[in-house]
Structure formats: C-alpha cells, structure tokens
Curated annotation (Swiss-Prot):
Residue ranges the record marks as coiled coil: none
Entry's Gene Ontology cellular component terms: cytosol
Species of the source: Pectobacterium carotovorum subsp. carotovorum (strain PC1)
Protein name: Probable Fe(2+)-trafficking protein
Pfam families named among the record's database cross-references: Iron_traffic
Subunit text: Monomer.
Family statement drawn from the similarity comment of this UniProt entry: Belongs to the Fe(2+)-trafficking protein family.
Length: 90
C-alpha cells in the first residue's frame, strides 16, 4: 500500500518511499519528506557524480561528498554541478 507525503523537493503531495532508504536521522527525514519521484531524480544525479568524479563507495571521503551533494540537491534546491557536463538540448 502506498503512502502519500508532502514532498519538500517537488513542493507537492506525492507517493512516499516504501521504507527508509538511508540510515540515521537523515534517512528518517528522506523517508518523511522525499517522494519516490524526487528520489529517482537524485539517483540519476548520484550516478552521474559517481561516474564523472570516479567516486568509490569504499572511500569515506567520497561517501561524505555524495551525502553533502544529496542534502544540497534534495533539501536546499541546489542542482548538482558536474564539471564538463552539458545537458542535451532539445
């Protein structure tokens, strides 16, 4: 059964996560405030960051960087900047 939350990223009601995806207090905040749609947008940005910056999830500093970028993207409205990336034009 899906649950509806007010997504702080999308600024509207949307389908919430089925379970807490991230540990700790930040994970609780994501579960309560970030929709599946917004999380999917973050996952796309996260994948780009990992690939373009050659991050390793085994490296503590890389994980911290990724967490900081996630907070900026999901809660502060700041887009992820990837040096050298140009979005496709339509």
């Amino acid at each position: 059964m899906s649950r509806t939350i007010f997504c702080t990223f999308l600024q509207r009601d949307a389908e919430g996560q089925d379970f807490q995806l991230y540990p700790g207090d930040l994970g609780k905040r994501i579960y309560n405030e970030i929709s599946k749609e917004a999380w999917a947008q973050w996952q796309t940005k996260q994948t780009m960051l990992i690939n373009e910056k050659k991050l390793s999830m085994m490296n503590v500093d890389d994980r911290k960087l990724l967490e900081q970028e996630m907070i900026k993207f999901l809660f502060e409205g700041k887009d992820v900047h990837i040096e050298g990336y140009t979005p496709p034009s339509h």
